[in-house]
């Protein structure tokens, strides 16, 4: 008989059985060596707690988040869900007990904010196990377990005849028990009434003087209740307690995001070199070359191409547009259909119209550039006067020559031409030509005589 409930298709929960998720998020994470609460550290551009909140919200009727004192940032992220404060950090059972008044009358699952990658499917399977779906009867207690590649010092789940008999910590395990590959992930689910009673009975007579949630497993077994393990992949149940583990979790999230992008019809030429944010949208037929970074808030429309070594955040790339290589799109930028943003071009809060091109070595900030306009190499918008930002508006079908400096606020009308090397400080009318540079003067023989004088000076020391 299998000792665990296998990873299977998700089961629907009975409509009459309410379920509450209690998320423990009070830990500061001393091993992270950070002033930031552990659950606020980002994975793929968003706080790790956000993943758990979003998945739990799709499964549970109610979510309660347990935070520590002074963790207003975490409480704000948890909104609109209920938040309770664990004034003294006295262990996981003590933390869960702070939410006991909000357990309700159905099932309660205790999740961990620093274990953010558990999927909604696994949460549903745990609740289904507790409710008895797929079994002859429900479990008095269901717990999540995994088979990590390196079991290391994880607590081992000891089973007999398909039921959990006990959790044994690595330090207390015999050689036979240490050989067990099924490990405890700490996530538990039980009926609200049972959970309240068990939490109230947990004692702190241990070396750390803390109240451990895992003790309720032994209580359930002692009462003769069925305790079952629901197995999930290690990547879902990994905890994050250090910067190294944060990096491992980031790699896991990136694998998920890349797989989703590929399944959605985007091409990633070298997926392992592309880094996505949790909210990155890549429409079908998007092509992403190697070594591209997507920050939060990026949408790339169908058929666009993002070339190598480009960095995008907070922007929209239109259908068929071409970005890079070595381009940077900053927040507030919107690149129109079939527009080009070339190598070493930076856009910030700039709209580039359909078919417009900025192919080389430009900075375009706080600007609106009309359709089919060409921006020459080296053009910049001078948008900042040291205190305020100012806008540059360039119409449709314009030609801005190379090395032009556009001093905002300034407007260039449709069809206008700006000569190369110009400094533009005044508005340019439609179809006009603007020339803002000093007239060239040639002095015959002056170059040779000047160089000769300089060489003599160098020889004289």
Curated annotation (Swiss-Prot):
- Record-linked Gene3D superfamilies: Hexapeptide repeat proteins, Spore Coat Polysaccharide Biosynthesis Protein SpsA, Chain A
Part of which pathway? Nucleotide-sugar biosynthesis; UDP-N-acetyl-alpha-D-glucosamine biosynthesis; N-acetyl-alpha-D-glucosamine 1-phosphate from alpha-D-glucosamine 6-phosphate (route II): step 2/2; Nucleotide-sugar biosynthesis; UDP-N-acetyl-alpha-D-glucosamine biosynthesis; UDP-N-acetyl-alpha-D-glucosamine from N-acetyl-alpha-D-glucosamine 1-phosphate: step 1/1; Bacterial outer membrane biogenesis; LPS lipid A biosynthesis
Region spans: N-acetyltransferase: 265-461
* Tagged with keyword RNA-binding: no
Q: Keywords of this protein's UniProt record, alphabetized?
A: Acyltransferase, Cell shape, Cell wall biogenesis/degradation, Cytoplasm, Magnesium, Metal-binding, Multifunctional enzyme, Nucleotidyltransferase, Peptidoglycan synthesis, Repeat, Transferase
A GO BP entry is: peptidoglycan biosynthetic process
Q: Where does Mg(2+) bind?
A: 114, 241
Q: What is its main location?
A: cytoplasm
What is the annotated localization of this protein? Cytoplasm
The UniProt catalytic activity note for this protein reads: alpha-D-glucosamine 1-phosphate + acetyl-CoA = N-acetyl-alpha-D-glucosamine 1-phosphate + CoA + H(+); N-acetyl-alpha-D-glucosamine 1-phosphate + UTP + H(+) = UDP-N-acetyl-alpha-D-glucosamine + diphosphate
Q: Which CDD domains match?
A: GT2_GlmU_N_bac (cd02540), LbH_GlmU_C (cd03353)
Q: Which Pfam families does the record cross-reference, listed alphabetically?
A: Hexapep_2, NTP_transf_3
Q: Where is this region: Linker?
A: 244-264
Residue sites binding acetyl-CoA per the record: 377, 383-384, 402, 420, 437
Q: Which GO terms describe its cellular component?
A: cytoplasm; membrane
Under InterPro entries, the record lists: Bifunctional_GlmU, GlmU-like, GlmU_C_LbH, Hexapep, Hexapep_transf_CS, MobA-like_NTP_Trfase, Nucleotide-diphossugar_trans, Trimer_LpxA-like_sf
- Describe cofactor binding as the record notes it: Binds 1 Mg(2+) ion per subunit.
Q: Give the enzyme's EC designation.
A: 2.7.7.23, 2.3.1.157
Question: What does the record give as the function of this protein?
Answer: Catalyzes the last two sequential reactions in the de novo biosynthetic pathway for UDP-N-acetylglucosamine (UDP-GlcNAc). The C-terminal domain catalyzes the transfer of acetyl group from acetyl coenzyme A to glucosamine-1-phosphate (GlcN-1-P) to produce N-acetylglucosamine-1-phosphate (GlcNAc-1-P), which is converted into UDP-GlcNAc by the transfer of uridine 5-monophosphate (from uridine 5-triphosphate), a reaction catalyzed by the N-terminal domain.
Spell out the subunit comment.
Answer: Homotrimer.
Under what name is this protein listed? Bifunctional protein GlmU
Q: What is the species listed in this Swiss-Prot or TrEMBL entry?
A: Gluconacetobacter diazotrophicus (strain ATCC 49037 / DSM 5601 / CCUG 37298 / CIP 103539 / LMG 7603 / PAl5)
Tell me the organism's taxonomic lineage.
Bacteria, Pseudomonadati, Pseudomonadota, Alphaproteobacteria, Acetobacterales
The encoding gene: glmU
């Amino acid at each position: 008989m299998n000792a665990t409930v296998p990873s299977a298709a998700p089961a629907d929960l009975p409509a009459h059985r309410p379920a509450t998720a209690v998320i423990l998020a009070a830990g500061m994470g001393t091993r992270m060596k950070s002033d930031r609460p552990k659950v606020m550290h980002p994975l793929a551009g968003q706080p790790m707690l956000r993943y758990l909140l979003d998945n739990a919200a799709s499964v549970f009727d109610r979510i309660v988040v347990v935070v520590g004192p002074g963790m207003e940032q975490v409480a704000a992220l948890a909104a609109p869900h209920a938040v309770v404060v664990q004034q003294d950090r006295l262990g996981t059972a003590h933390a869960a007990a702070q939410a006991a008044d909000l357990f309700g009358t159905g099932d309660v699952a205790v999740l961990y904010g620093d274990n953010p990658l558990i999927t909604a499917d696994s949460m549903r399977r745990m609740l289904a196990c507790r409710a008895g779906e797929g079994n002859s009867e429900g479990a008095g207690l269901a717990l999540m377990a995994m088979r990590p590649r390196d079991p290391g010092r994880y607590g081992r789940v000891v089973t007999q005849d398909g039921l959990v008999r006990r959790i044994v910590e690595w330090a207390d395990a015999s050689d036979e028990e240490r050989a067990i590959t099924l490990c405890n992930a700490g996530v538990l689910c039980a009926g609200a009434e049972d959970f309240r009673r068990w939490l109230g009975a947990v004692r702190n007579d241990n070396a750390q003087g803390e109240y451990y949630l895992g003790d309720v497993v032994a209580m359930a077994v002692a009462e003769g209740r069925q305790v079952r393990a629901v197995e999930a992949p290690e990547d879902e149940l990994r905890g994050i307690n250090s910067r190294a583990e944060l990096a491992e979790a980031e790699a896991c999230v990136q694998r998920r995001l890349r797989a989703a992008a590929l399944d959605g019809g985007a091409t990633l030429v070298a997926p392992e070199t592309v880094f996505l944010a949790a909210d990155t949208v890549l429409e079908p037929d998007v092509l992403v070359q190697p070594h591209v970074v997507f920050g939060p808030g990026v949408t790339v429309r169908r058929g666009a191409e993002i070339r190598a070594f480009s960095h995008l955040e907070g922007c929209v790339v239109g259908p068929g547009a071409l970005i890079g290589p070595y381009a940077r799109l900053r927040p507030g930028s919107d690149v129109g259909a079939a527009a080009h943003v070339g190598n070493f071009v930076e856009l910030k809060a700039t709209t580039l119209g359909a078919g417009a091109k900025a192919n080389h070595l430009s900075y375009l900030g706080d600007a609106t550039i009309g359709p089919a306009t060409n921006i020459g190499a080296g053009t910049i918008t001078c948008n900042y006067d040291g205190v305020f930002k100012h806008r540059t508006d360039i119409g449709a079908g314009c030609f801005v020559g190379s090395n032009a400096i556009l001093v905002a606020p300034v407007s260039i009308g449709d069809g206008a031409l700006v000569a190369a090397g110009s400094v533009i400080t005044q508005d340019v009318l439609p179809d006009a030509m603007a020339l803002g540079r000093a007239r060239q003067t040639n002095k015959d023989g002056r170059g040779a005589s000047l160089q000769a004088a300089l060489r003599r000076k160098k020889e004289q020391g």
